[in-house]
């Protein structure tokens, strides 16, 4: 696959990467001439995006991971951070929404840590179920090991959900009001989650400024 990708990029007149992170990979890993590689950040068309109103059946705060449960998305770091948060506060639940090859391993790890009563696996979500999940959420987290861009944080922030993202993601280049941590730094991740859950002023500012920020991420500005 690498050889085919390299051949295609060498034959191209211009290559559009979805972030500077991806642009650097194309240049450094594939040896492509930097002058023909440009970064054009993704945007989201929110014209038909409507927030959902939901009634919650629990008083606990909800922290959500939404994505494929595979190595690239960093689910294991989410689980370890969840464990650390639950050592300090019990009125929180963690939701892993998605499916993937690390699902069973993640379930086993949650059980081994003794936090299964505070951790929920929804399986794959789409469409209105995704919007509903954001409506339930108090914090969204994307701890990706590597992410060319990442659309889900934009959707979460549009839904007024304070968000935490890994520094190893392309979307980190365009978001100032998402909290950023290294994917491997579960202490920083846990501290960020705890802060957003327990300091209303921080969560409110993050949500309010986040909505304004993603509203300005239009294709004409990409």
Over which residues does each language-model region extend?
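Conserved donor-binding/catalytic core segment of Leloir-type glycosyltransferases
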Residues: 16, 57-82, 95, 207
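Short alpha-helical donor nucleotide-sugar binding micro-motif in glycosyltransferases
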Residues: 124-125, 132-137
């Amino acid at each position: 696959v690498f050889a085919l990708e390299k051949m295609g990029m060498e034959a191209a007149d211009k290559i559009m990467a979805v972030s500077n992170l991806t642009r650097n990979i194309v240049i450094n890993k594939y040896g492509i001439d930097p002058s023909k590689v440009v970064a054009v950040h993704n945007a989201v068309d929110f014209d038909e995006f409507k927030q959902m109103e939901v009634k919650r059946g629990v008083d606990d705060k909800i922290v959500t991971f939404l994505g494929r449960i595979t190595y690239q998305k960093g689910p294991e770091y989410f689980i370890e951070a969840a464990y650390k948060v639950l050592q300090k506060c019990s009125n929180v639940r963690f939701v892993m929404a998605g499916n993937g090859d690390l699902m069973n391993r993640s379930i086993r790890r949650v059980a081994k840590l003794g936090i299964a009563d505070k951790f929920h696996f929804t399986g794959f979500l789409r469409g209105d179920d995704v919007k509903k999940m954001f409506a339930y959420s108090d914090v969204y987290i994307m701890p990706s090991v590597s992410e060319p861009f990442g659309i889900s944080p934009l959707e979460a922030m549009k839904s007024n959900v304070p968000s935490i993202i890994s520094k190893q993601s392309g979307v980190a280049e365009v978001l100032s009001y998402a909290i950023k941590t290294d994917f491997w730094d579960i202490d920083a991740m846990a501290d960020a989650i705890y802060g957003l859950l327990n300091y209303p002023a921080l969560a409110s500012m993050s949500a309010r400024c986040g909505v304004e920020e993603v509203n300005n991420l239009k294709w004409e500005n990409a």
